Amino acid sequence: MKEMDERKQEGELHLLGGSTVYKQDYAPEVLEAFTNKHQGNDYWVRFNCPEFTSLCPITGQPDFATIHIDYIPDVKMVESKSLKLYLFSFRNHGAFHEDCVNIIMKDLIKLMDPKYIEITGIFTPRGGISIYPYCNYGRPNTKFEQLAEKRLFDHNQ
């Protein structure tokens, strides 16, 4: 509890511990980051988000998915409540499945500048077809750029 109070006092976190306002459309501005206290270590962080929803931009029908977010942090890390509110903001947003995962990845790169990140969307079937889009990013000119290429080429093998 002391650590959270320190982070709130340092101005890093604003949403955690407060009342919740749910945005009605895509809202990247709700994302918050905090300082990684283990910057000397390379390690994975995984978020499993089983209740993601968005709207088909053509039909307006809801799409449902589990979103997996895996990243190797550097200086900044995404705060989980802000991530939850951000993902919730897609609920009334029209975007194709492939767009959703790429938008999420780009917004998280902008927020955190991670060493490596990958996003997988496991969308439930509509019309008898499931779509599982995957995207990734590794920081250019580092071993993480090579990791991104390898994981992309080895994906689903």
From Swiss-Prot:
Its main location: cytoplasm. It is an enzyme of class 1 (oxidoreductase). It is found in: Cytoplasm. Signal peptide: none annotated. InterPro entries: GTP-CH-I_C/QueF (IPR043133), NADPH_dep_7-cyano-7-deazaG_red (IPR050084), QueF (IPR029500), QueF_type1 (IPR016856). GO terms for cellular component: cytoplasm. It comes from the Bacteria. Its EC number is 1.7.1.13. Belongs to the GTP cyclohydrolase I family. QueF type 1 subfamily. This is NADPH-dependent 7-cyano-7-deazaguanine reductase. It comes from Parabacteroides distasonis (strain ATCC 8503 / DSM 20701 / CIP 104284 / JCM 5825 / NCTC 11152). The gene is queF.
